[in-house]
Amino acid sequence: MFTLKKSLLLLFFLGTISLSLCEQERDADGDEGEVEEVKRGFLDIIKDTGKEFAVKILNNLKCKLAGGCPP
């Protein structure tokens, strides 16, 4: 019974240490995560603008090839 208590206490102690280490890493990564979100937002804007531009060009080409462009 004593060895069971000892091993449970050891598991609890190791779990507490690993949990505190994970929280410290998460706090340290939290600052970097904000920068990554801003970069992602900026890249999404560029990507969406590029898609809109490509769609307009393809529509103009399709219109010119078909020969029926509305003014």
Curated annotation (Swiss-Prot):
GO terms for biological process: defense response to bacterium; innate immune response. Residues 1-22 form the signal peptide. Expressed by the skin glands. It is found in: Secreted; Target cell membrane. Keywords: Amphibian defense peptide, Antibiotic, Antimicrobial, Cleavage on pair of basic residues, Disulfide bond, Immunity, Innate immunity, Membrane, Secreted, Signal, Target cell membrane, Target membrane. GO terms for cellular component: extracellular region; membrane; other organism cell membrane. Residues 23-40 form a propeptide. InterPro entries: Antimicrobial_frog_2 (IPR012521), Frog_antimicrobial_propeptide (IPR004275). Disulfide bonds join 63-69. It comes from the Eukaryota. The keyword Secreted applies. Belongs to the frog skin active peptide (FSAP) family. Brevinin subfamily. Antibacterial peptide with amphipathic alpha-helical structure that exhibits potent broad-spectrum activity against Gram-positive and -negative bacteria. It is active against Listeria ATCC 54004 (MIC=30 ug/ml), S.aureus ATCC 25923 (MIC=7.8 ug/ml), S.suis 2 CVCC 606 (MIC=31.25 ug/ml), B.subtilis ADB403 (30 ug/ml), K.pneumoniae ATCC 700603 (MIC=60 ug/ml) and P.aeruginosa ATCC 227853 (MIC=30 ug/ml). Does not show activity against Salmonella ATCC 20020 and the fungus Candida albicans. Is also cytotoxic to HeLa cells at high concentrations. This is Palustrin-Ca. It comes from Aquarana catesbeiana.
